[in-house]
Regions:
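Ser/Thr/Gly-rich low-complexity blocks that favor extended beta-strand/coil architectures
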Residues: 34-57
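Generic alpha-helical secondary structure signal
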Residues: 25, 34-37, 49, 64, ...
């Protein structure tokens, strides 16, 4: 198990309910989760249908992403119960997990 951070990773999903995300293939111009992650690797992700959204920590497993921890969402920070409509799902770096050091060596954390 490794913690994966990578650029330009984005797929679609038609997952409904609150279960694992079934990954539907890379969006045009992006790479698939499988290009950067192996089974049991952990990632920060965001999912959206342009109305609802969810940000969390997920575990990759054979072209699916298991919701491990929901960090924030449009559903009062709980798992979103999705309809079967197509959604975007991508790697992200959540603000609440960010630690930033500026040019004066001052450190701040996101919220």
């Amino acid at each position: 198990m490794a913690f994966i951070v990578a650029d330009r990773v984005k797929e679609t999903t038609a997952t409904s309910g609150t279960g694992p995300y079934a990954l539907g293939g890379a969006a045009t111009g992006f790479q698939a989760f499988s290009a950067v992650a192996s089974n049991d690797d952990v990632v920060y992700y965001a999912a959206t249908d342009d109305t609802n959204w969810e940000v969390g920590l997920g575990t990759y497993s054979s072209n699916s992403l298991i919701r491990t921890t929901i960090l924030s969402s449009s559903n009062s920070d709980a798992a979103v119960s999705w309809t079967s409509a197509i959604k975007d799902i991508f790697l992200t770096y959540p603000a609440e997990e960010a630690v930033i050091e500026d040019s004066s060596n001052n450190v701040s954390v996101g919220n």
